């Protein structure tokens, strides 16, 4: 059973402004972005990688943030910061103005035959995209402090076919926005011939229930 980490209603790559005027132009404000990043370790401060989409070159982001010793490499975060030189693809030192842990999971080692009612609870899908080895989901789910079943589960028969299993607790009430990152590394290493994955989802938003992601 899983307890989701909620991050509120931050919009991915939402443009915000800082309060730093430049000497040359007091009207100028540097644009900040909010992106999903991957914690890779510590070098004086926490270091993160950012991949925008698909197989874009990672931007290595160095910060002065001191992380809890229990945080492991691969944990995903939603980070707001001003990009290096205003370029999101550039590596260098950044100063996060917010940093929120995001639910991060591997593909399940069970198969979908274990979940005959895999689509019992709907997922209001807002967006889904692959960034490197991560499949990212931004969605609305009914809020509850009770554990729920949420997993990306492979088909028992069809290679490259996965199911987003969601079974919400009975006391779930109002909807809340969540980001979820699934690490595909292990699954793809076991299925190296794939050129795409197909994800089935009980999507209560646009009724697009099968999503295809090229690899």
Q: What does each model-identified segment do?
A:
Residues 20-23:
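Bacterial signal peptide processing site
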Residues 15-18:
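C-terminal motif of bacterial Sec signal peptides marking the signal peptidase cleavage site
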Residues 29-215:
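First exposed extracellular module after export/assembly in secreted or surface-exposed proteins
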Residues 1-6:
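Bacterial N-terminal signal peptides that target proteins for export
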């Amino acid at each position: 059973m899983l307890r989701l980490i909620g991050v509120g209603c931050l919009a991915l790559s939402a443009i915000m402004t800082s309060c730093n005027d430049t000497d040359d132009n007091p009207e100028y404000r540097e644009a900040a972005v909010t992106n999903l990043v991957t914690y890779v370790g510590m070098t004086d401060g926490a270091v993160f990688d950012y991949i925008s989409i698909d197989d874009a070159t990672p931007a290595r982001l160095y910060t002065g943030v001191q992380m809890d010793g229990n945080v492991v490499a691969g944990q995903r975060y939603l980070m707001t910061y001003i990009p290096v030189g205003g370029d999101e693809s550039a590596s260098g030192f950044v100063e996060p103005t917010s940093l929120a842990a995001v639910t991060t999971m591997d593909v399940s080692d069970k198969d979908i035959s274990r979940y005959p009612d895999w689509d019992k609870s709907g997922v209001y899908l807002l967006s889904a995209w692959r960034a490197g080895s991560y499949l990212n989901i931004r969605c609305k789910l009914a809020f509850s402090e009770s554990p729920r079943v949420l997993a990306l589960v492979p088909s028992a028969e069809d290679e490259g076919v996965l199911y987003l299993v969601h079974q919400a607790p009975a006391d779930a009430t109002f909807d809340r926005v969540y980001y979820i990152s699934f690490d595909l590394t292990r699954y793809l290493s076991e299925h190296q011939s794939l050129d795409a994955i197909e994800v089935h989802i009980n999507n209560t938003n646009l009724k697009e229930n099968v999503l295809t992601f090229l690899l």
